[in-house]
Each structure stands twice: as structure tokens, then as C-alpha cells.
Swiss-Prot record:
UniProt family annotation: Belongs to the MinE family.
Protein name: Cell division topological specificity factor
Coiled-coil residue spans: none
Native source organism of the sequence: Chromobacterium violaceum (strain ATCC 12472 / DSM 30191 / JCM 1249 / CCUG 213 / NBRC 12614 / NCIMB 9131 / NCTC 9757 / MK)
Keywords from the named record: Cell cycle, Cell division
Amino acid sequence: MSLIDMIFGKRQKSAAIARERLQIILAHERNGRHAPDYLPALQRELMEVISKYVSVNLEDIKVQVERQDDYEVLEVNIVLPEHQR
């Protein structure tokens, strides 16, 4: 909405304003989201699979999602015990 439109009374409909605000809120939430909801479950399942072969603690498995350009990158780091490397 331009300054002239605001002065002379041309108004957007409330539905259009609400939609615009919702799009802004959703964009901020998507950009501000640090960890997807599935990460804790993914970490537990990885622990179950890895523990079949190697003895590790849950704290030794780190799962992160990072944004690089237009892609989301899933990074998994597992600290293995010295004697099982």
C-alpha cells in the first residue's frame, strides 16, 4: 500500500492484509526454525541401529540440519570409542 493510497483512502480488503501478514509470519518461522521436529526420533533410531554393531552413548551421536544456499543438509556425527575404531 503506497502513501498516496493511504492518504486518499484506497484500502486493501482485510482478507488480503491477513494473507500477506500470514505469509510474512510463515517465512520468518521457516527461516528461524533451528531443528526439525523429527530430529530426536531420528537420533534415537540411529542409536538403536548403531548399537547393534558398536557400543556408543546417545550423547555421542549428534544430528543437525543446516541450511546451505537453497538446500537443507543433514549432518550426522558419531563419536566411536577408541577400542572399536
